[in-house]
Amino acid sequence: MGGAVSAGEDNDDLIDNLKEAQYIRTERVEQAFRAIDRGDYYLEGYRDNAYKDLAWKHGNIHLSAPCIYSEVMEALKLQPGLSFLNLGSGTGYLSTMVGLILGPFGINHGIELHSDVVEYAKEKLESFIKNSDSFDKFEFCEPAFVVGNCLQIASDSHQYDRIYCGAGVQKDHENYMKILLKVGGILVMPIEDQLTQIMRTGQNTWESKNILAVSFAPLVQPSKNDNGKPDSVGLPPCAVRNLQDLARIYIRRTLRNFINDEMQAKGIPQRAPPKRKRKRVKQRINTYVFVGNQLIPQPLDSEEDEKMEEDNKEEEEKDHNEAMKPEEPPQNLLREKIMKLPLPESLKAYLTYFRDK
């Protein structure tokens, strides 16, 4: 499934294409997509395919096409502080993007059938926290993953504000999914080859809307134990953050706000991700001449075409010159502020989430 937009050269290029095709429509979703490099969730040797609008599968590891994830993120209408459940959380790519929007006071849970994929997701999550330049630019709701079949969730489990299911849902499982949703919540899942948004408007009332034609593998049916019944799966607890963690969140937030105020006072704009300049397409002006009794179009270069060619050459030269300049190391102002605080080194390390950069 996918192929709706052109392939990108890198993550930013892919996001530009998704925006241009109207799959990404809101700034909040765009920021989350730019912050998480899709290529980081591919196995070594397969990264070249990361920026194509195509699904990817290797063994139990699976990523949906970027256009699908874009529609899902937009349809969920995420807000800070909400609770989210990802049914079939896979590599954790979607859950990590969701966590950037939910912020530190949200709930971010995922359930995945394959234990090796859960381990893969945890490794990718740890790598994002430790190594990504984007981590310090957001307040993050870290996903918690459990192994299990999403059709075996314990009946006394809590409900969620937002739910996504990444596998095809049969009609007879639709109500099971709906019960997991809070009143006022949104559930996005594929039903009968349609990605569907379901809103719970009351205790027993729902509104549904088809978003996109899709093709998903169906949910795996649960296996039964010796008693002939499937074992139930417990979801992660909705834990309250401790005071130490809350202090870290608020210290980092205060420093980040201070940095933003400083930059505004100096007239320094917040750095936006680089956008690629697309070459303008050369257009032709046609003249028409009669040949016998037929009117034949004859292409004629316009002055505007010549100017476009000159502009494109100038842009290529400028891009080449920029590429030849030595890259400046990225500046992490939040880290710099933390390291200047009059605190023991162990506390500074805690405030930086033990990141090395």
Curated annotation (Swiss-Prot):
InterPro entries reported in the protein's UniProt record: PCMT, SAM-dependent_MTases_sf
Region (AdoMet binding motif): 85-94, 160-164, 181-191
Superkingdom, natural source: Eukaryota
Compositional bias per record (Acidic residues), positions renumbered to this chain: 301-317
Primary subcellular site in the record, as a coarse category: cytoplasm
Region (BC-box): 240-250
Membrane topology, as annotated: Lipid-anchor
Listed GO CC annotations: Cul5-RING ubiquitin ligase complex; cytoplasm; membrane
Keywords: Cytoplasm, Lipoprotein, Membrane, Myristate
Active site: S64
Cytoplasm as UniProt keyword: yes
Region annotated Disordered, chain positions: 299-333
Biological process according to GO: protein ubiquitination
Cross-referenced Pfam families: PCMT
Compartments, record wording: Cytoplasm; Membrane
Family statement drawn from the similarity comment of this UniProt entry: Belongs to the methyltransferase superfamily. L-isoaspartyl/D-aspartyl protein methyltransferase family.
PANTHER family: PROTEIN-L-ISOASPARTATE O-METHYLTRANSFERASE, PROTEIN-L-ISOASPARTATE O-METHYLTRANSFERASE DOMAIN-CONTAINING PROTEIN 1
Biological role stated in the UniProt entry: Substrate recognition component of an ECS (Elongin BC-CUL5-SOCS-box protein) E3 ubiquitin ligase complex which mediates the ubiquitination and subsequent proteasomal degradation of target proteins. Specifically binds to the methyltransferase cofactor S-adenosylmethionine (AdoMet) via the N-terminal AdoMet binding motif, but does not display methyltransferase activity. May provide an alternate maintenance pathway for modified proteins by acting as a damage-specific E3 ubiquitin ligase adaptor protein.
Domain notes from UniProt: At its N-terminus, contains L-isoaspartate and S-adenosylmethionine (AdoMet) binding motifs. Also contains an extended SOCS box motif, where the Cul-box is separated from the BC-box by ~90 residues, within its C-terminus.
Self-association and partners: Component of the probable ECS(PCMTD1) E3 ubiquitin-protein ligase complex, at least composed of CUL5, ELOB, ELOC, RBX2 and PCMTD1. Interacts (via the BC-box) with ELOB and ELOC; the interaction is direct and stabilizes PCMTD1.
The protein's name: Protein-L-isoaspartate O-methyltransferase domain-containing protein 1
Species per Swiss-Prot/TrEMBL record: Homo sapiens (Human)
